[in-house]
Amino acid sequence: MDEDVGLEATNYSRGDESRSEEQEKNVVRWRIVQQSTGPNPKPRHGHRAVVLKELIVIFGGGNEGMIDELHAYNTQKREWTAPQCCGDVPTPAAAFGAISLGNKIYRFGGMTEYGKYTNDLYELQSTRWEWRRLNPRVHSNGHLPCPRIGHSFVVSQKSQKAYVFGGLSNDLNDPKRNVPHYLDDLYVINLSGPQHLIWEKLNATGPGPISRESHTAVIYEKDSISRMVVYGGMNGVRLGDLWYLNLNTLHWTEIKFDDPRTGIPPMPRSLHSSVLIGDKMFVYGGWVPLLEHASTEQQTEKEWKCTSSLGCWNITEDRWVPLHLYCSDEDTIPRGRAGHCAAAVGDRMYIWSGRDGYRKAWSNQVCCRDMWLLDTILPEQPGKVQLGRAGFNSLEISWPIVQGASGYFLQIGFGDAKEQSVSPIKRATTSPRKQPSIVPPSQKETEQSPKKPQGTAPSIISTQGTTYTAPADPKPATDEGGLPQDLFEDTEKNETASPKRSNDAQSADSSTCEQKKTDESGLEEDSEKDQKPSDAGETDEMKEENGDDDLPWFDVGIIDKATINVTHYFNDRQQSLEKQLNDLIDHNAFKCVNDSVFTTEDKIPLINGQSYRFRVSAINGLGKGAWSETASCKTCVPGYPSAPSSIRITKSHEGAQLTWEPPSNTNISGKIIEYSVYLAVKNQSANSADSQLAFMRVYCGPQADCQVLQSNLGTAFVDQTNKPAIIFRIAARNEKGYGPATQVRWLQDQQKIPVRTNYPNNSGFIYQQHGGQQKRARFDHQ
C-alpha cells in the first residue's frame, strides 16, 4: 500500500468499539466485489461511470483501441448487463465527461483517436437505451466549448445546469500534430429544456484555479448552498489544490491548507477519482509524484506512480478528514491505479478497472479487471417488516431495500407475553420435532376488533407489503399450509414506499374504513351470518409493537435479499448469529434457517393462528446497523381458504380484465363463496403528505374473474417503486370467512397512461409506450 499521510492503516475489530466510536474514527473498509453474474466488461482506462438509481452505467475508454460497449452493473443484484443501444450512437471515445440527470445520461467531449478531440454533446435515454446527438446553440458573439479531453463535467440536480471546466485541447486540431494546451475556461448549459440548449461561457469573479486537465469536480448542494468543488489535476506537474465555485454568485475561492484546522491533505494527483457521499468528497487513486525525484531534469516515468491512497474532504467543515482502514492487509485493499472510474451508490463508493501503473504487457498498459466497494458508514435502519402473504405455517415477508447493505439480519419473536407463555420454545429445544398444540382463538382477539363484522376482510391493507404473483399449485394441497414455491425470486421487486410513513398505518386504516363503508356494506350483511374467524381475514394487517420489549428474540438468518418465506427459526442449540456475525461478514457469507443443511433438530416451525414479531437490521462490511421498528403479523387459522393464484391481467377498452385460479386448498377448506378484489388508491386524509395508501374494493362476487372499469383505474395510485405499477389484492371467502390475499403489481410500462415521475427534470407526467392491448401483463413476482 502507498504511504499517504491522509490515511491511517489500522486493523479494527467490531467487538472492540461501539458504533459511535467507529464513526468518530472515520473507519472505512474496502471489499472486493465477487460473484457477479452477467457479461463482464473489458478492462480499460479513460472510461466513465454514472449512476441511475441502483445501476452503475460504464462506457467508453479503451486499452487496445477504443471500446464502444456500454455495460450496467446492478448493485442490488450484483449483476452485469450489456444493453443494446440504438439511435445516434456516438463514436467511441475516452477521457470525456459524463453525467446523469433523471433517467438520462449526457456525454461531452473526449478523444476519439490519438490527437483527435471532440466537443460533441450526446444524450442517452436510459428507458430505451437510445442515443441522440444534441446541437446546442451559443449566445450572440459566443463560441462553443472547444474540443477537449480530461475536463470535468458535472450537473446541478436543482437547477439542471451542467458545467464544464478545464481540460486539454489540441491547438493545431490536427491528429498528426498534437500541440497540447491546458484550459481554464468555464461553460454552462441548461438541460431543463432539451429543445433549446445554449452553451454559455461564464466569467467567474475572484482569482480562479490555473488551467489543468485530469482533475475532478463534484457539486455539493444543501439548502441555499450550491458549490462546485474542483480538486487536483495536471498542468505539467501534479496538482493538489482545492477550489470552491459558488454557483449562486459565480465566485471562485481557494481553500488554503496552511491552516492546521484544514487537516493534512493527500498527495497531489491526477487521473484520480472523486465522489460525493453526504457532505464528504472521497478521493481515490491516480498518479502521484514520488517522494524522491531523479537527479536528472528530464522527466521519466519513474518520477510518479499510481497510488491506492484515499483522501476525504469534509465540505461543511472545510477540512481533510483522516480515514482509518478497517483492515490494511495487502489482499484487502485495491492496488494502485489511474484512469479508473468511480461511482457513489448510497453510502458506498465503487471503483472499477483503470491502469495498473506497475506492469506493462508489450506496448499496452495492463488494466485492472476488478471492482471494489468502499463502505464509509454503517447501513441505515431498514423500514418495518411488511407481510406479503400469510400461510398456516409460514409468513412471506419483505422490507424496503437498504442501499449499501450486503445483507440483512432477521429475527422473530412471539407476539406478546400471553402468547409467549403458551409458546413451545423451551420444550422445542429438547424435543424439536414435537409440534405444540394449536391455541384456540382467545377472547382477546375479539376485544381487539369488536366492531369488525364476522369473516370480513379488511377494507384497507397496508401497501408496504411484498408484491408477487403466485402461480397455481399443480398438485392438490395435502394440508392447509401449502404455498407456491416460486415466490420471491427477484429482490428488485421488493422495494416499497418510504418506511417513514408506516407509523401512520393504523390511523390511515381507520380513517379510510369510514370512507369506504358503503363499498363494504354488501360484505357486512352477508358476514353477519358467519362465525367469527380467528383473525384469518386480518393476516395482511401489520401492527406496530409498543411493548413487550423484554420478550426474547430468535434468529431466522443472515440473508442477502430483502424478502423471505419464514417457516422456521433457530432453536437455542445453534450459536447465536450475533456471535457469528463478524466471521460471516469477513467471509461474505450468509446463514439462514431455510438452508438445506439444517434439520428439524436445529429449528422450530411456525404454528398456525400464532402472532409473531419481526425486526431486521442491515449489514455491510463495517457491521450491523440499527434494528428496524418491530412489526407483527399472524399465521392463518385452519379452515380458511388460501390465497388465489395465477393472476392474469389484460388491458381492454373498458379497463382491465382480471382472472385467477381458486385457492389450492379448496378440497380441504370447502367451497368458495365469493372473491374480493381491491385496488390501491391514495388515501385522502387531511395530512396528504403522510397518508398511507388505501385499498378500495372494486369487485365482490363468486366468479374467478372480474372487469375493473377505467373509471376505477383512474383513481388508482401508480406505484413508482422500481417500475410504474398498479397494485391489486385478491382474497377468497368460504363459509368461515376470508383467507389471506394475494398482492400483485400490474406493470404499466406497456401502457400509455400518465405516470407520475420523481425525476428532477420532469415535474409532471411521462407517458409509457403503448403495447398490445391484449398482451399479458408482466408482474413483479417474488
UniProtKB/Swiss-Prot annotation:
Bias kind Acidic residues: ranges: 537-552
Subcellular location, principal: nucleus
Assigned keywords, A-Z: Kelch repeat, Nucleus, Phosphoprotein, Repeat
Superkingdom of source: Eukaryota
Subcellular location: Nucleus
Subunit and partners: Interacts with daf-16/FOXO. Interacts with deacetylase sir-2.1. Interacts with the 14-3-3 family proteins ftt-2 and par-5.
Sites of Phosphoserine modification: S423, S431, S449, S498
Reported effect, S449A: Drastically reduces phosphorylation in vitro
Gene Ontology MF annotations: DNA-binding transcription factor binding; RNA polymerase II-specific DNA-binding transcription factor binding; transcription coactivator activity; transcription coregulator binding; transcription corepressor activity
Skewed-composition ranges (Basic and acidic residues): 14-25
BP GO annotations: chromatin remodeling; dauer exit; defense response to other organism; determination of adult lifespan; negative regulation of protein localization to nucleus; negative regulation of transcription by RNA polymerase II; negative regulation of transcription by transcription factor localization; positive regulation of transcription by RNA polymerase II
Annotated transmembrane regions: none
Role played: Transcriptional coregulator. Involved in control of the cell cycle and in modulating mitotic histone phosphorylation. Plays a role in modulating lifespan by regulating the transcriptional activity of daf-16/Forkhead box protein O, in concert with protein deacetylase sir-2.1/SIRT1, and perhaps acting independently of the Insulin/IGF-1-like signaling (IIS) mediated pathway. Negatively modulates responses to environmental stresses, including oxidative stress, heat stress, and exposure to heavy metals; acting via regulation of the transcription factors daf-16 and skn-1.
PTM info: Phosphorylated at multiple serine residues. Phosphorylation is developmentally regulated, occurring in embryos but not L1 larvae. Phosphorylation may be cell-cycle-regulated.
Bias kind Polar residues: ranges: 423-434, 456-469, 496-513
Protein name: Host cell factor homolog hcf-1
GO CC, alphabetical: histone methyltransferase complex; nucleus; transcription regulator complex
Kelch repeat feature ranges: 55-103, 105-151, 161-222, 227-271, 280-324
Gene symbol of the encoding locus: hcf-1
